[in-house]
Curated annotation (Swiss-Prot):
Gene3D superfamilies on file: Multidrug efflux transporter AcrB transmembrane domain
Protein name per UniProt: Putative membrane protein SCO6666
Provenance organism: Streptomyces coelicolor (strain ATCC BAA-471 / A3(2) / M145)
Leader sequence segment: none
Bilayer topology annotation: Multi-pass membrane protein
Transmembrane segments: 16-36, 144-164, 177-197, 201-221, 232-252, 280-300, 306-326, 360-380, 504-524, 528-548, 561-581, 615-635, 636-656
Keyword terms: Cell membrane, Membrane, Transmembrane, Transmembrane helix
Gene Ontology terms: cellular component: plasma membrane
Length: 705
């Protein structure tokens, strides 16, 4: 397959570049439409009690979405403010698609006790199509923002479909800013690596293809499932980072090949045959790591896993087709690598020899140190999060802060909703209804009764969680179901706990098979997984320490929220594990190549690290720059994911790959490459091998006359 791709790219480079040009137009033209289709992060898990109950209620009483406005003033009872608000309420009731707008002055609980704020709730009609709903939301928001006057100090509007629209606009701005920050820095680093603009510019072209692929993949998935506002940032930063990494690996190999092969086309073929296989397996390992997300029956996690996997495939194809085509056309102008193999990477060779010579000491220091950093993971907690996760400049966050400042805890939080199906006995209904004060009752068609219990605080707080568990304990065998945000979180946490072992088994099995196919060893995959888990645990522990416990949160613009976003841990684990496999394959490819050439196991470790250390370090720095740029947006989940991935790649590329890998390889010795005879025969037949670089082929001799 790789030889076919190489031939196509070298024989028809202009055609390949034209096809990728059309792909870029499609990605940046059609794909950017995804920013208008983003939603806030909802942990729906099909088949769970909370989701089944919510769907049952929607079928009986298809209520429309709602938006909320908070009006702040020195005194909302001021006649001028009252007149402005009531004028706006009257206007809102005339908006097409609006079902209900209660008078805040006549509705209990909507005027703050301090008299300095009030809430205006706008409920839309159910069953509106997308265009009608968007028009109604925009019109209603404009009329709420129209509440002004000298006595009004501020109006904040958000919620429902407006929240998704606001987050989409902010996400688009953040992605643009992150690209403007990261691309110039990446270019500077590539200039340092390659010493010339021609070579440095090619990875950026591949990166642009990765970004277009991210937009297009998400736009496609947005037509079949909800796409979280955080998905666009995660996929874009990963698409950009991996594209640069893969292009870097290919370009470094191309320059090495050009050192002894004058023919550009031949050098491209040998680059694809050697480094291309590493890129292919790297992409597959990242995709397998993300396959673990498909085990979770969560629409969000599955759509995220599929979207990111699609982006990885686009990056991989761009590195294997677009870059070879570009090298065919412009590679002759790129100077070959200057240093000889025995001269390059001396620092990494010294590190490898030190770690191999002091392997027991290195393991005795590095492993406990990483375990200590990972300790906070044992107390990790996740929650739904609230508007505190949003940047303070977003209107949704400003609305949240206004409610927090003027109203009692729990105001504006969705209640714990209890669905009493037909057949529920009166005694059970009475016991549940008496749990919390302020319970409201609604009767729906078909004999269903709904109890709405005040959550008593944030939907992801301990009071709401305890309330859900108490209701479920009290119902016995009665046909009673609990839904609402708090119940969704309880079910989501339980789903993660139930499916996490299966997800881990899926990922580890897939990784083991791929690494065995790549190396022919059964011990190397086990060693790789063990060392990768150390770096992953340390990175996740640091994220918990910063964001959950609140240490050092200020310098990076975060807040100690007492828990991580429910999206952060699974995404950090899946993506970081795949990225770590990337670096492992970069190093193992060089080690195996040196071992097959020399037969010396220990020297192969040194040579492998010497030849790959610079690439791995540069790749980690480039990814860290990209992840860091996306952390400037201020979304707390993105800050958590960005910090986790940045630390994971830096720890993995330094402590793990530069110290633990040579130390463990030296400890295993020749047994590192061991496999039972049946598996060894299977690998000889079905395994994957790279073509090692060698001298340029001799020129053809003229035919005898």
């Amino acid at each position: 397959m790789l030889s076919t791709l190489a031939r196509a790219a070298t024989r028809r480079p202009l055609t390949v570049m034209l096809l990728w040009g059309l792909f870029l137009l499609l990605g940046f033209g059609l794909g950017t439409g995804v920013f208008g289709r983003l939603s806030d992060d909802v942990p729906d898990v099909p088949g769970t009690e909370s989701q089944v109950a919510a769907e049952h209620l929607d079928g009986l009483d298809p209520a429309g979405d709602s938006i909320t406005g908070v009006v702040e003033a020195a005194a909302v009872a001021d006649p001028a403010v009252r007149a402005e608000v009531r004028r706006a309420v009257a206007d809102l009731r005339e908006v097409a698609g609006v079902a209900e707008v209660p008078d805040p002055y006549a509705t209990p609980g909507t005027v703050a006790e301090d008299g300095r704020a009030l809430v205006v709730s706008v409920t839309l009609e159910g069953g509106l199509d997308d265009d009608a709903e968007e028009a109604a939301v925009d019109d209603a928001a404009d009329r709420l923002h129209g509440i002004d006057g000298s006595a009004v100090s501020g109006v904040h509007v958000s919620g429902g479909p407006l929240l998704g629209q606001q987050l989409g606009e902010r996400a688009q701005e953040d992605v643009k800013n992150a690209e403007l920050i990261s691309l110039p820095v990446v270019l500077v680093l590539l200039l340092v690596v390659f010493g010339g603009l021609r070579a440095a510019g090619l990875p950026l072209l591949v990166a642009v293809a990765g970004i277009a692929g991210a937009f297009l993949a998400l736009f496609g998935f947005s037509h079949v499932t909800d796409i979280s506002v955080y998905a666009i940032q995660v996929t874009t930063m990963l698409g950009l980072g991996l594209a640069v990494d893969y292009a870097l690996l290919m370009l470094v190999r191309f320059r090495e090949e050009r050192r002894h092969i004058p023919d550009v086309v031949e050098a491209v073929h040998r680059t694809v045959a050697a480094a291309g296989r590493t890129v292919l397996f790297s992409g597959l390992t990242v995709a397998v790591s993300l396959a673990g997300l498909l085990v979770f029956p969560s629409t969000f996690l599955r759509s995220m896993g599929l979207a990111v996997a699609a982006v990885v495939v686009v990056d991989m194809l761009a590195a294997l087709t677009l870059l070879p085509a570009l090298l065919t056309r412009f590679g002759g102008r790129i100077p070959p690598a200057k240093a000889r193999p025995e001269e390059e990477g001396r620092l990494f060779a010294r590190l490898a020899r030190f770690a191999a010579r002091r392997r027991v000491a290195v393991l005795a220091v590095a492993v406990p140190a990483l375990l200590v950093v990972a300790l906070p993971v044992t107390g990790m907690s996740i929650n739904l999060g609230d508007a505190r996760q949003l940047p303070k400049s977003t209107e949704a966050r400003q609305l949240y802060d206004a409610i927090e400042a003027h109203f009692p805890p729990g105001t504006g939080v969705s209640p714990v909703t209890v669905v009493l199906r037909p057949g529920t006995d009166t005694a059970t209904a009475d016991r549940i209804g008496a749990i919390a004060g302020g319970t409201t009752v609604r009767d729906l068609p078909g004999g269903t009764t709904v109890l709405e219990l005040p959550a008593g605080g944030a939907a992801d707080g301990p009071a709401a969680t305890e309330l859900v568990e108490r209701v479920r304990d009290l119902r016995g065998d009665a046909p009673v179901q609990v839904t609402g945000s708090a119940a969704q979180l309880v079910d989501f946490r339980q789903m993660l706990a139930d499916r996490a072992p299966w997800a881990a088994l899926t990922v580890l099995t897939g990784i083991f098979v791929l690494l065995f196919a790549f190396t022919g060893s059964v011990l190397l995959p086990l060693r790789t997984v063990a060392t990768t888990l150390l770096s992953l645990g340390a990175a996740l522990g640091a994220v918990v320490w910063v964001f959950q416990d609140g240490h050092l949160a200020g310098p990076i613009g975060a807040e100690g929220l007492g828990a991580l976003s429910l999206t952060a841990p699974p995404l950090i684990i899946a993506i970081a594990f795949g990225l770590a496999m990337d670096y492992e394959l970069f190093i193992l490819a060089r080690m195996r190549e040196a071992r097959e050439r020399t037969g010396d196991d220990r020297e192969a470790v040194v040579t492998g690290l010497r030849r790959s250390g610079r690439v791995v370090t540069c790749a980690a720095l480039l990814l860290a720059v990209v992840f860091g740029a996306f952390m400037t947006g201020g979304f707390s989940p993105i800050l958590q994911i960005g910090l986790g991935l940045t630390l994971a790649v830096l720890i993995d590329a330094t402590v793990v790959r530069m110290l633990l890998v040579p130390a463990t390889m030296a400890l295993l010795g020749r047994h590192a490459w061991w496999a039972p005879k049946p598996l060894r025969r299977a690998h000889e037949r079905f395994g994957v091998r790279e073509e090692a670089p060698g001298p340029a082929p001799a020129p053809p001799q003229p035919a005898a006359r």
